[in-house]
Curated annotation (Swiss-Prot):
Pfam families: SelO (PF02696). Its cofactor is Mg(2+); Mn(2+). Mg(2+) binds at N257, D266. Its EC number is 2.7.7.-, 2.7.7.108. This is Protein nucleotidyltransferase YdiU. The lineage of its organism: Bacteria, Bacillati, Bacillota, Clostridia, Eubacteriales. The gene is ydiU. ATP binds at G94, G96, R97, K117, D129, G130, R180, R187, D266. It comes from Clostridium botulinum (strain Okra / Type B1). The keyword Metal-binding applies.
C-alpha cells in the first residue's frame, strides 16, 4: 500500500484490534485520494464526547484525514469482508466503498470504529466506483444524529467532506465522504460470511473477538456462544421496539445491515412515518413491502435466525442439540420485543403500571389512527397536551369511546395526572426528521451550498422532547402532494 501517514494531533487515539482476526475478514486498503476536499459539516458535540480536537480537524491536514488523503500515523486502514441476505437472497458483499481507519479509544476508555464512507474502490466494490454523493451523506448525517437525540442506539456521523469530484449516478452529482463512528461494524452478515467461506476456527475467532469487544460481562461457566446469541437477540429486541415506538422505517433490513452491537446502521432508504399505516414503505426497491413498518419485528427475528444458523457448530457438538438450543433462543425474541414495545407504548400513554388489558387499549388506538389517517407523531403529541381536537381524530365517535377508556385506565394507577403528562412528554417527541423538512435542507445544501437550513433543522432535532415553539415549523405535516414520499438507497 502507498504510504501516506502523518503525525497530526487530532485527538484520534487509534488501534485496530480487528486486524488481530484472520485475514479472511479484511483487506488492507488505503482510501482513494480526492482532488479538492472541503469540510461541509462537522459534529462538534460528538467531537467533544470523543475527546477530539475540533480546531485541528478543521485544518487542511485535518480535512485531508477526513477525506482519506492522509491517514493518522497509528491507523491501519482496512475494508471489511461480509456477506448478507438482501431481500431474502444470500450474496457476497463487503465494504464496497468504505475504509475503517481504526478504533478510537476515548479518554474514558471507550472504543469506537472510525470509518470513511465513500472513500473509493475496494476489493469488495463489485464493479462500483466506491464513491458517495453529497446528498445521501448529508442525509445519513441528519438522520443518524436525530436518532441519537431520540435515544435510539445508532452509528454516529462525525463529519462530511466534499471531495471536489463529480460522480455519475442517474445524473452528475457532487462527491462526498462521511466519517462514521460506530461501536463496531460487526454484522450478522460478518458471521454469515465466515460461516459460508471460512473454517470453524475462523468462526470461533470472530465469535470470541465479538464477545471480548461487546459482551465482556459474561459468565464463563455458561456456553459463551449461546450467551452471545442471547445478548444480540436482547439488543435487537430493544432496538426494533424503539424503531416502532418512534415510527422509524429502516427500509433495507438485510442481514448485513443488522449490527451485533445493537446499533442502527446504514440509513439508505430510511424515513419516518407520517400517517400511521403498518404497511408504510418508502424504499423504491421494496415493491413487495418486505421491509414495511409493520413487518420490521418479523424481519428482525428472521435475521437473527440466520445469525443462529452460523453459530450452530459452536453451540453444541451434536447438530440436533445445537438446533434445539438455537431455536429456543430465537423463540425469546418475540416475547422480548413485545415487552419492550408494550412498556414504551405505556409510556407514550402516560401509564406507569401494567394491566393485561393494556395491549387491547393500545391496539384499539392504533386501529382508529389507521382508519382515519392520523399522523403518528402528532397524535401522541396531541394526547400529551390533551388537544386532540387539533387532529383528524377530534369528534370521531370511536376515538371518543377510546379516550374515555384511556382516562379510566389512568385513574387506576397511583401516579398523578401531572406525572403521567411528564412521562408522556419524555416518551413522545415533539419533532422528528419529517421527510419533507429533510429534503428541504438537503436541497438548500446540495443545490445552493446553503447549509443554514440544515443547521436549523439539526438544532431542532437535537432537542426532540423540548416542546419549544421554535419546533412548530418542523412538526407541520407535508402537503398532500408530497405525501407519497419515496427513498432511494444512496447511502
Amino acid at each position: 500500500m502507498e504510504e501516506r501517514k502523518v503525525i497530526i494531533k487530532t485527538g484520534l487515539n487509534l488501534e485496530n484490534s480487528y486486524t488481530s482476526l484472520p485475514e479472511i475478514f479484511f483487506t488492507r486498503q488505503n482510501p482513494n485520494r480526492v482532488p479538492s476536499p472541503k469540510l461541509a459539516v462537522l459534529n462538534y458535540p460528538l467531537i467533544t464526547s470523543l475527546g477530539l480536537n475540533a480546531q485541528v480537524l478543521q485544518s487542511t491536514d485535518g480535512v485531508d484525514i477526513l477525506a482519506g488523503n492522509k491517514t493518522p500515523e497509528e491507523a491501519i486502514p482496512i475494508s471489511q469482508a461480509y456477506a448478507g441476505h438482501q431481500f431474502g437472497h444470500f450474496t457476497m458483499l463487503g465494504d464496497g466503498r468504505a475504509i475503517l481507519l481504526g478504533e478510537h479509544i476515548t479518554p474514558q476508555g471507550e472504543r469506537f470504529d472510525i470509518q470513511l464512507k465513500g472513500s473509493g474502490k475496494t476489493p469488495y466494490s463489485r464493479g462500483g466506483d466506491g464513491k458517495a454523493a453529497l446528498g445521501p451523506m448529508l442525509r445519513e448525517y441528519i438522520i443518524s444524529e436525530a436518532m441519537n437525540a431520540l435515544g435510539i442506539p445508532t452509528t454516529r456521523s462525525l463529519a462530511v467532506v466534499t471531495t471536489g469530484e463529480s460522480i455519475m449516478r442517474e445524473t452528475e452529482l457532487s462527491g462526498a465522504i462521511l466519517t462514521r463512528v460506530a461501536a463496531s461494524h460487526i454484522r450478522v452478515g460478518t458471521f454469515e460470511y465466515v460461516s459460508r467461506w471460512g473454517t470453524i476456527q475462523e468462526l470461533r475467532a470472530l465469535a470470541d473477538y465479538t464477545l471480548q469487544r461487546h459482551f465482556k460481562k459474561r459468565n464463563d461457566k455458561d456456553n459463551p456462544y449461546l450467551f452471545l446469541l442471547q445478548e444480540v437477540i436482547k439488543k435487537q429486541a430493544e432496538l426494533i421496539a424503539k424503531w416502532q415506538l418512534i415510527g422509524f422505517v429502516h427500509g433495507v433490513m438485510n442481514t448485513d445491515n443488522m449490527t451485533i452491537s445493537g446499533e442502527t446502521i446504514d440509513y439508505g432508504p430510511c424515513a419516518f412515518m407520517d400517517v400511521y399505516d403498518p404497511k408504510t414503505v418508502f424504499s423504491s426497491i421494496d415493491i413487495y413491502g418486505r421491509y414495511a413498518y409493520g413487518n420490521q419485528p418479523n424481519i428482525a427475528a428472521w435475521n437473527l435466525a440466520r445469525l443462529a444458523e452460523t453459530l450452530l457448530p459452536l453451540l453444541h457438538i451434536n447438530p440436533n442439540e445445537a438446533i434445539k438450543i438455537a431455536e429456543n433462543a430465537i423463540s425469546d425474541f418475540t416475547k422480548l420485543y413485545k415487552n419492550n414495545w408494550l412498556s414504551g407504548m405505556r409510556g407514550k400513554l402516560g401509564i406507569f403500571n401494567e394491566e393485561l388489558e393494556d395491549e387491547y387499549l393500545i391496539e384499539d388506538l392504533l386501529s382508529i389512527m389507521h382508519k382515519y389517517g392520523a399522523d403518528y407523531t402528532n397524535t401522541f403529541r396531541a394526547l400529551t397536551f390533551d388537544n386532540i381536537e387539533d387532529t383528524v381524530l377530534g369528534g370521531k365517535v370511536e376515538f371518543d369511546k377510546w379516550y374515555k377508556l384511556w382516562q379510566e385506565r389512568l385513574t387506576r394507577q397511583e401516579e398523578s395526572k401531572l406525572s403521567s403528562r411528564q412521562l408522556m412528554k419524555s416518551s413522545n417527541p415533539s419533532v422528528i426528521p419529517r421527510n419533507h423538512r429533510v429534503e428541504e435542507a438537503l436541497e438548500a445544501a446540495v443545490k445552493e451550498g446553503d447549509y443554514s437550513v440544515m443547521e436549523k433543522l439539526l438544532d431542532a432535532l437535537s432537542k426532540p422532547y423540548a416542546y419549544s415553539k421554535e419546533q412548530d415549523y418542523y412538526s407541520t405535516l407535508p402537503e398532500p402532494s408530497t405525501c407519497s414520499y419515496q427513498t432511494y438507497c444512496g447511502t
